[in-house]
């Protein structure tokens, strides 16, 4: 069940990024200033990173539930990813 669920989530995430990348050039022509263009690109890149980290955390959480390994959530890697996700979200909100 988990591999199918993971495939669906990954497919949706990739579709989202393809749509946003398709719209990005149109947004860049609207901004007209190099500084605003750079900020827009940085925010898009950061959004991709945040969404990817969120997906990894979701898979890790679901994986630990289905494989009965609750220690997975306590690993150093997932703690670091969660901390990075929170700091990136704080940055996006402050912009």
From Swiss-Prot:
Keywords: Host membrane, Membrane, Signal, Transmembrane, Transmembrane helix. The keyword Signal applies. One of its GO terms (cellular component) is membrane. The chain crosses the membrane at residues 53-69. Residues 70-95 are cytoplasmic. Residues 23-52 are extracellular. Its main location: host cell. It is found in: Host membrane. Residues 1-22 form the signal peptide. The keyword Membrane applies. It comes from the Viruses. It is a single-pass type I membrane protein. This is Uncharacterized protein ORF95.
């Amino acid at each position: 069940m988990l591999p199918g669920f993971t495939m669906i989530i990954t497919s949706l995430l990739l579709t989202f990024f393809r749509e946003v990348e398709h719209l990005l050039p149109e947004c860049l022509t609207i901004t007209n200033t190099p500084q605003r263009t750079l900020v827009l690109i940085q925010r898009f890149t950061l959004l991709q990173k945040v969404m990817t980290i969120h997906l990894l955390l979701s898979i890790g959480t679901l994986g630990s539930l289905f494989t009965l390994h609750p220690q997975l959530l306590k690993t150093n890697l997932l703690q670091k990813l969660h901390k990075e996700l929170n700091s990136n979200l704080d940055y996006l909100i402050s912009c």
